Regions:
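Short S/T/G/P-rich N-terminal loop/turn motif that feeds into the first structured element of a domain
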Residues: 1-44, 57, 95-108
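A short linear hydrophobic-aromatic micro-motif
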Residues: 44-50, 86-87
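Structured loop/turn residues at beta-strand edges in well-structured enzyme cores
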Residues: 45, 55, 81
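An amphipathic, aromatic/His-enriched active-site/gating alpha helix that lines ligand/cofactor pockets
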Residues: 64-96
Length: 108
């Protein structure tokens, strides 16, 4: 399984505070609907963590999936559930990067 990081933004740059407030007020229900839809359409994924963020992105979800196609489905379903922006990263464990660097050797 590969590890992916899903970043989401609920509202656009120039959203009114009332728009943001209404989305946040409805977030527990809509978040549960999103998770249930993902579990139904992508049963092979396993979520590892969910975070609310203080910055450009509103939330970060770390999950494992078999491949990039599955990650693309997660991203598309997230957009269907109202996220204004979505970005997905493939996360490689640090130990694997170290191993790759060792295999390449110095100067290669």
């Amino acid at each position: 399984m590969k590890t992916f990081v899903l970043l989401t933004k609920l509202s656009g740059k120039n959203a009114l505070l009332t728009d943001i407030g209404s989305k946040l007020g409805d977030r527990p229900r809509s978040g549960l609907e999103w998770l249930n839809d993902l579990r139904k359409q992508c049963p092979e994924i396993t979520f590892k963590a969910h975070f609310a963020l203080m910055g450009y992105w509103d939330s970060m979800h770390i999950y494992e999936a078999q491949d990039e196609e599955c990650a693309a489905r997660v991203s598309m379903i997230t957009r269907q559930h109202g996220a204004k922006e979505v970005e997905t990263w493939l996360a490689i464990p640090y130990e694997k990067i170290v191993k790759i660097a060792e295999e390449l050797g110095p100067g290669k």
